[in-house]
Structure formats: structure tokens, C-alpha cells
């Protein structure tokens, strides 16, 4: 999408990202968790945020469902709306990262093209984390009861059932929630961040 507004100019401010990061004693970054519904994105992100918070880091967790209660409440689940959902979150995440915040985003984000756009916007501040869990395990978990509804035809365009999920080609981190414990998954991300 292009900018529709005319007669606007970017206003530079005197406080820069480096000033905010120095104040916070941390670097802003976007940790983007992608995977099927029920794969464990929100569960992993919640524990990850707690561990980072316990370590004295300023974080913000952007959860796919929570964001749809406010900022993206006008969006449905058509392909176009999913694309706009991710675009808005990418722009919001860029602002949070510029503020020096460790931003954790948990979005199915089923399309590679849209995740690449997020990466292009955030550049080296983007860390793609693929929460890999087989569809059949996600369906067994079904914490929201939505796979059952999708299989019964009550929900259309449901990712993994009648709408595709495009697996990341070269994610920065892959976690396997059906093979590893929650703690092991979170520790893998923490180890990555410590080495970064």
C-alpha cells in the first residue's frame, strides 16, 4: 500500500533509537513466531516474555488474537485481511523496536511473501522463529475448538485446513513443540539471543 495522505513530511526528532537503547540498556528487536494455530506460539511467547522480563528486559508481546480485539478489529480472515493484519503489525513492531523494546509477535502469518515484507521492513532487527508442530498434533490440542469448527465447515479459509500455511524457508530459529518441552523451546530462543 502506498501513502494516501498528501502534504506530509517526516519529522525528525532529537531523541534517537540509540538514545533509547542506551537508556534501556538493551537493543530493540522483533521476535516473530509463526506457525499453525495450536502449535504453541502464544504459550512459548508468554514464557519467553516472562524470562526476558525476569532478566530485566523491557518487552511487549503482540498476540494475534489480542490485536484483533483492538487495532485490527476491523479485519476478518480473507487473504486480503490477513495481509493487512500482518502489514499493520509489522509497522507497529517497527515503532516498538525503534523505542528499544524487545517485541515478541505471535501470528500464524501463513504467507511467505508477507513474512518477507516484515523482514524487509525490520531488516536485521527481525528474527523469524518457526514454531513447527504437525497439523494432526495442533488439531488434537485445539485449545480454541476451531479446528473442529473448520472441519465441520463452520469456519472458512482456516489455515491448515482449507487455506494454506507456507512453511518458512530459512527461519532463524526452529522449535518443535511436539518433541521438546516448553522450557527447552524457550531456552533455545534465549540462547540465540545471548549469542546475537
Report the location of each language-model feature:
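Extreme N-terminal, non-catalytic leader segments
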Residues: 1-30
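The conserved Walker
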Residues: 37
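Conserved lysine of the Walker
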Residues: 41
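Conserved substrate/cofactor phosphate-moiety recognition/catalytic segment
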Residues: 46-94, 98
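Conserved beta-strand scaffold positions in the cores of enzyme catalytic domains, especially
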Residues: 61, 126-130, 172-174
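ATP-dependent NMP and nucleoside kinases share a basic, alpha-helical "lid"
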Residues: 70-81, 91-151, 157
Amino acid at each position: 500500500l502506498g501513502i494516501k495522505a498528501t502534504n506530509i513530511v517526516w519529522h525528525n526528532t532529537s531523541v534517537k533509537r540509540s538514545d533509547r537503547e542506551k537508556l534501556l540498556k538493551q537493543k530493540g528487536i522483533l521476535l516473530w513466531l509463526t506457525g499453525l494455530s495450536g502449535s504453541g506460539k502464544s504459550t512459548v511467547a508468554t514464557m519467553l516474555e516472562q524470562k526476558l522480563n525476569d532478566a530485566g528486559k523491557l518487552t511487549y508481546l503482540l498476540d494475534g488474537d489480542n490485536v484483533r480485539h483492538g487495532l485490527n478489529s476491523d479485519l476478518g480472515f480473507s487473504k486480503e485481511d490477513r495481509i493487512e493484519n500482518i502489514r499493520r503489525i509489522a509497522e507497529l513492531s517497527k515503532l516498538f523496536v525503534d523505542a528499544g523494546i524487545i517485541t515478541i509477535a505471535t501470528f500464524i502469518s501463513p504467507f511467505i511473501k508477507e513474512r518477507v515484507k516484515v523482514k524487509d521492513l525490520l531488516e536485521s532487527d527481525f528474527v523469524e522463529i518457526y514454531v513447527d508442530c504437525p497439523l494432526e498434533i495442533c488439531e488434537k490440542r485445539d485449545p480454541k475448538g476451531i479446528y473442529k469448527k473448520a472441519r465441520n465447515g463452520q469456519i472458512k479459509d482456516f489455515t491448515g485446513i482449507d487455506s494454506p500455511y507456507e512453511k518458512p524457508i530459512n527461519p532463524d530459529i526452529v522449535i518443535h513443540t511436539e518433541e521438546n518441552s516448553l522450557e527447552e523451546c524457550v531456552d533455545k530462543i534465549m540462547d540465540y539471543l545471548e549469542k546475537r
